[in-house]
Amino acid sequence: MAVLPLFACGSPQTNLPKTAIISTTLCADGYLHSLPGIETRLAALSWQSRSGLSQTPQHLRALPQTDNDLERRLNWSSGIQVSSAGGGGDIDLKWGEDFQTVWDNLDLLASNLNVTDPAATLQARLGSLKPPTTSPLILYLDRSGATAGPGTFVDAVINAAGGTNIIKTAGWQSPDTETLIGLQPDIILSSFLDSNYVGVNDRTLRHAALEDKIRSIPQINLPGRYWTCAGPGLIDAAEHLNQAILAL
């Protein structure tokens, strides 16, 4: 598949066609990759497009990279710049932690870029998920021991996959270790535990009792790239989680 000519990282192509698309953030990368027939119009992706959190396919990782820096964005001004909420692009994505925001952003992009909206296809994928016989209680934990309740994209994915979030307090939170150990989930859902980064707040890796708790319960680890910016990767997350639940 042909793409726009490749140049060195951050080096803009002169005389870009007006239909060329420049992504200035990792969030925008993820959304653009979900649009059909868009690859030939991509001129640049975000500075994180080659990172472990990126869903950029290998054959597009050589594309130039850019970001929201005003001066660098001026270099790409002849194309259509897509950014995150408040990013100052020609198209700025909305922020939200639910599937409706994903559909809204896809509609925004499809209408402005004159491409087919993939929302119906993605919604059909969610609708085809097989519910488990019994909805398991699921506890989400990241490396720091933080978790997520109603109103978060993690909660949206758990529900879509047929699970029940054991955390009932809304929003993102960091319960004390004793509270976490006292919970009785059927499954622990984790992400980023296999990352090479090690931090001083990595309770799930550094607290022996919590680590023992995690090891005593079935654990499902989702790739961190699925969660990026609560974008279309949430559909992948829901599918992955649903399949893992059914396999237990």
Regions found by a protein language model. Give the residues of each.
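C-terminal motif of bacterial Sec signal peptides marking the signal peptidase cleavage site
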Residues: 6-8
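Bacterial signal peptide processing site
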Residues: 10-12
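Extracytoplasmic substrate-binding proteins
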Residues: 15-20, 79, 85-146, 163-168, ...
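A short, structured surface patch at a secondary-structure boundary
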Residues: 20-88, 169
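Short secondary-structure boundary segments
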Residues: 25, 85, 143, 170, ...
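Alpha-helical, coiled-coil/dimerization segments enriched in small aliphatic residues
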Residues: 46-55, 59-60, 147-173
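Short acidic active-site motifs
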Residues: 69-72, 175-179
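A ligand-binding cleft/hinge motif common to bilobed small-molecule-binding domains
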Residues: 86-88, 189-205
